[in-house]
Each structure stands twice: as C-alpha cells, then as structure tokens.
Amino acid sequence: MYTYQTVVRYEDLDAQGRVKIPAILNYLENAAVLNAAAVGYDMDRMAELDLCWVVMCWDVKLGRRIRWNEALTVETWPYQFYGSIGKRGFRILSAQGEVLAEADSW
C-alpha cells in the first residue's frame, strides 16, 4: 500500500465551501502517480517506454464532508491485474483515521 499526505486547499472548494469532486479525483490520481514513481515508473520513465496510465472508470463513495485546510492521508493499492489492465483501490482518511472517501478505478 502506498500513502501520501496532503491538505485541502482553498482552490479545492466550491462556492459553498465543499470540496469539489474533481479535487477528490485529483487526490486519488496523485496517489496513483506517486505510487508508480516510487516503484520506478515516474513520468520520465513512462515516456521513455511510450507508456501511459488511463483511468477508464471511477467508483467513488464519499463519507462526511471534507473541510478546508484539513490534513488528509491518501492510500492506494493495485489489485486484480489482467495483462496490462488492472484495478486500483483508494481511501482518503482524516488525521484521526476516519474514512472520508473510498474508491476503485479501472
């Protein structure tokens, strides 16, 4: 499992102060890209190999509202590979370990 820490930024909020769905997806995508880099497949290496990551679908379940300036831990792990296609799980946790979002991508 790969984890990284982030903080909810002002630009991640909508006019009502709620975290925008695209911001949540960005947290998840960043986790996947950072995980790939940690195992030797950063953006430069992927370009050398003429490879890229493509997310075909998201399944996201949201918990309580994520707040501005809240410290988050984002977790990710790959699973169920079929050749070059695989799934990836994600969780976003509060500083207290509360699950704020869960997701799968493929």
Give, region by region, the residue ranges found by the protein language model:
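Hot-dog-fold acyl-thioester-processing enzymes
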Residues: 1-55, 102
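HotDog/MaoC-like acyl-thioester-processing domains
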Residues: 2, 61-106
